[in-house]
Amino acid sequence: MRLFIPMVVFSFLLSQNIWNGVSVATPDNLDAISSNPAGLGIDRGEQSGTYLSFDSKYTNSSSFRSNGFGYDLTYNIHSHGLFNPEDGNIGVGFSPVRNFYTGIKWNKHSFIDLGFLYRPFNFISIGSAHKFSDDFEQYEYSTYGVAIRPLFNHRLTIGADYNDMDSGVLTY
């Protein structure tokens, strides 16, 4: 009983971050759609997931990815119909050269994310994701990340991200 409350609190905290991974340097699974679209280029087979949040808006999120393509949709009480989700993303990713991945994602709210991921070895990943308006007139922000696996397997990954929030109009 002594450990029950800390375990419930810990599991509750983990469940608040539905698909998001540790870092933009580790977008291996469904989190590739939300964090770094370059992760869609990593072959993980077909994956799908649904998350029901018991919040005041009755949020329902579902994601799918396969063969470099992925999407996620979020519905809640403010959504009006099947073809009008509250939020939606669709993206593609691929590997132009060995151990380097790139991807692009479009968001329903008129944003484009460009993502890059480099894994020279299985124990280190370097990634970045950059958000723009879908006409590329407005730069929103960039996130740069690095992650290492000190035990040389997937059981422990340590990652850190740097967010560059310097928004502004792009000049050419």
Go through the PLM ranges and name each one.
Residues 1-4, 96:
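Positively charged n-region of N-terminal signal peptides that target proteins for export
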Residues 3-13:
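Sec-dependent N-terminal signal peptides
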Residues 16-172:
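Subset of outer-membrane beta-barrel
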